[in-house]
């Protein structure tokens, strides 16, 4: 009898474990890669269209700031998608890139988009948002639940608010609360744009695959979206459009079945309206955070993935180093 070495006894199950992990990894990669290609090849946004306005949303405004545009002619309205508990981001934005009402003599108006708090402390959270609204007068809210899957409802609310209460704005920007905006450069860009009612620009996403993998956040089912590719759209981190186009999109939204991703949903509307995305000439929109560099941040318009403390720090650095040349 020849005893089996202890090391060999442990190696056998280890081999099987490694083999299983290898097969699982290959299988996962295959699924993620090829399942994205199983949808309908040619994207047809009219698939989502209904002749009757059956998708008109009837959520009620619980905070609406309906008089903000009554006595002014805004050049630009910036609507920031936020969540009830994200007070720090709103405070950071108010103290930094939304702190000035005028840039180059043009009136800028910034407001925040919220749904109802989903947490256990609903009453307390709602009360604090109400207090915040009284203090700053810059919160728009409807009575849907504030969840990731309801971001499209929040964007529909934004377009409805502009249409009903601020139809005189020249431009609209929809952005997120974790975005740093160089407001001066944003206004400069808008002043350079052609006076067209079809202007729509931001960080363009062209020929983006509909994701069918395991990440719930980016997954979309075939039932909800049966096509391989999304139509051209701009990332929801910050897109800008003509005020009249915003009203046309809102009117169309009543006919378009909402999908999970608000930026793709707006892209579907643009496609049906036959509006092309204007691709910025310079790289000024950043989908992912870039490290702070004074000259880079002086040149950009919007960068995504920035914390409230970074928004404040970056703004202070830019404001205190105006004499530095790039």
Predicted segments, located by residue:
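Secretory-pathway lumenal glyco-enzymes, predominantly type II signal-anchor Golgi glycosyltransferases
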Residues: 1-326
